[in-house]
Amino acid sequence: MATKGKRARAIEQTVDKTKAYSVSEAVKLVKSNAKAKFDESIEIAINLGVDPKYADQQVRSVVNLPAGTGKTIRVAVFAKDKKAEEALAAGADIVGADDLFEKVNGGFMDFDRVIATPDMMGLVGRLGKVLGPRGLMPNPKVGTVTPNVAQAVKDAKGGAVEFKVEKAGIVHAGVGKASFSDADIEKNVQAFISAVVKARPSGAKGTFVRKVTLSSTMGTGVAIDLAEAKS
């Protein structure tokens, strides 16, 4: 424990907590401090000027990260007939209808994303208590309820990241791995920030983006200059 504490203190000392860094500087700092024995995730957190308890201040959308996430995403698709075939051809890990409903209802959860064709939502809706708390319920706002299941599967596999504001007014996501190049992480960070700014709700007043922080799994947070956050 002492060694871990010493390492944490050493990492803290490399970051000036009174400063906001450029995206490129922040990426370099975060990567240089990602010294765990595993490939740490690089994570972004954005504090927003919204109160999510109001319907017109909800923030939810999806962004395709240009350099991917570095994670293997398992995709389940609720579809029938030709649409089921299209989903499988696009790389879905499990495809079904009533049979998949029974599996999931029985506790099967070996997937990270759920996609459904519109005609399947009557069935999928009955899984709300199972999928909802895990953030897995398909939603047309983020492109997971769609007749174009093939594209949705490709997006999910290729770096599509859903985000939703939390009670404290924060959105966060993984934007890569420490093993990614600086340029790839920078592209992902900029894409995520842009997507959040575009998702500004009608009820948001004043400054929308209040704070942007980049960190690794075991590292300390590094503040990003809001001028670069396009607020």
UniProtKB/Swiss-Prot annotation:
InterPro entries: Ribosom_uL1_bac-type, Ribosomal_uL1, Ribosomal_uL1-like, Ribosomal_uL1/biogenesis, Ribosomal_uL1_3-a/b-sand, Ribosomal_uL1_CS. One of its GO terms (molecular function) is rRNA binding. GO terms for biological process: regulation of translation; translation. It comes from the Bacteria. Coiled coil: none annotated. GO terms for cellular component: cytosolic large ribosomal subunit. Keywords: Repressor, Ribonucleoprotein, Ribosomal protein, RNA-binding, rRNA-binding, Translation regulation, tRNA-binding. PROSITE patterns: RIBOSOMAL_L1 (PS01199). The keyword rRNA-binding applies. Binds directly to 23S rRNA. The L1 stalk is quite mobile in the ribosome, and is involved in E site tRNA release. Belongs to the universal ribosomal protein uL1 family. PANTHER family: 54S RIBOSOMAL PROTEIN L1, MITOCHONDRIAL (PTHR36427), LARGE RIBOSOMAL SUBUNIT PROTEIN UL1M (PTHR36427:SF3). Part of the 50S ribosomal subunit. This is Large ribosomal subunit protein uL1. It comes from Hyphomonas neptunium (strain ATCC 15444). The lineage of its organism: Bacteria, Pseudomonadati, Pseudomonadota, Alphaproteobacteria, Hyphomonadales.
